[in-house]
A protein has these predicted regions:
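Phosphate/diphosphate ligand-binding glycine-rich loop within oxidoreductases
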Residues: 45-123
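Phosphate-coordination loops involved in phosphoryl transfer and adenosine-cofactor binding
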Residues: 2, 65, 140-143, 211, ...
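C-terminal helix-to-coil terminal segments
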Residues: 2, 84, 91-104, 118, ...
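Rossmann-like adenosine-cofactor binding region
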Residues: 53-59, 172-264
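N-terminal glycine-/charge-rich "phosphate-binding" loop or analogous flexible N-terminal tail
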Residues: 1-44, 164-168
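Phosphate-binding beta-alpha-beta segment of Rossmann-like dinucleotide-binding domains, i.e.
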Residues: 94-143, 158, 162, 170, ...
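Glycine-rich Rossmann-fold phosphate-binding loop(s) that bind the pyrophosphate
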Residues: 149-150
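N-terminal Rossmann-fold NAD(P) dinucleotide-binding loop
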Residues: 153-154
Length: 312
């Protein structure tokens, strides 16, 4: 009997084909909440999960489950420790989207530095003089602070180097670098003209960027968050943006997604908002789907996965 794999309905066809060629039965769902998966496919041996929260449940409800493969890098939507204790691997796809996220990070930095979206919106209203009171700034010579220096952070640093930016790095797990300078946490906030976040969310850093950090930042500084919404205290960020304690922000991730339409972020002119598009290219989606599928294949064939974030 074929083993079943639960997948998102919108998973790239290359990912689906990889699993089909390996001989698995696919259960395609739009709703990948734990309750939906248990109800629809309790016999499944694997789940490919995107960014939706996945609740813990009694493993006896899915006794064949061996792997939850995250389609992406972050895994704060699944309790890896809980599943490891229940004999289920949680895996990620760390090599699939680093360059894409770095490119999108710089697209948002460029947008803010040149007021592209704001100027385009005003032009559509017939306000051709908006540009005269909203001039941009050059990136060359500016200081880019990078918090989190993994695969994505390193790619961002390479791009910043091309723009002749000064690069500062904060990552407590990194001891040496051949690009930029390592600084302490306080200095990354106080010295950066643009600060970009590329860290995983942990219990230690959840909502760890707030009023104190915004007070340290220059009032001309920009915050770029394509990492995770939970890294930032969003109420305190709203206050900092309203009171111009920092000049602006580009936000691609939020505590609640989609961002509710009544969010005050929509009312602020100094914020660029995008709906979690950091890795939203055809190439990255295909890469993540195939890498997640290959992790499933390894585990269901009795092998160890390449990118597990937990132990069983």
């Amino acid at each position: 009997m074929k083993k079943s794999v639960v997948i998102p309905k919108n998973l790239s066809q290359k990912g689906k084909d990889t699993l089909l060629h390996a001989g698995f039965n696919l259960v395609e769902l739009e709703d990948l909440s734990a309750s939906s998966v248990i109800k629809t496919a309790p016999e499944a041996s694997a789940i490919i999960l995107m960014t939706e929260p996945f609740e813990n449940f009694d493993i006896t409800k899915m006794p064949n489950l061996k792997i939850i493969a995250r389609h992406g890098v972050g895994y704060d939507n699944v309790d890896d420790d809980f599943w490891g204790k229940n004999g289920v691997y949680v895996t990620i796809t760390p090599n699939a989207n680093a360059s894409t996220v770095a490119e999108t990070t710089f697209a948002e930095i460029l947008d803010l530095s040149k007021n592209l979206t704001a100027t385009s919106n005003e032009m559509r209203k017939g306000n051709f003089d908006y540009k005269n009171s909203h001039r941009g700034f050059n990136l060359a010579g500016k200081t880019l602070g990078i918090m989190g220096f993994g695969r994505i952070g390193k790619q961002v640093a390479k791009l910043a180097n091309v723009f002749d930016m000064k690069i500062l790095i904060y990552d407590p797990f990194v001891k040496t670098t051949n690009i930029g300078s390592l600084v302490n946490r306080e200095d990354i906030f106080s010295q950066s003209d643009i600060l970009t976040l590329h860290m995983a969310v942990t219990e230690d850093n959840k909502a760890g960027i707030g009023s104190r950090e915004f007070e340290l930042m220059k009032d001309t500084a920009l915050l770029i968050n394509l990492g995770r919404g939970a890294l930032v205290n969003q109420d305190e960020l709203l206050e900092a943006l309203r009171e111009k304690k920092i000049a602006g922000a580009a936000l691609d991730v939020f505590n609640e997604e989609p961002l509710p339409l009544n969010s005050e972020f929509y009312q602020l002119e100094n914020v660029l908002l995008t709906p979690h598009i950091a890795s939203n290219t055809k190439n990255a989606m295909e890469n993540m789907a195939v890498d997640a599928a290959n992790e499933v294949i390894k585990v269901l064939n009795g092998e160890s996965p390449q990118w597990a974030v937990n132990k069983i």
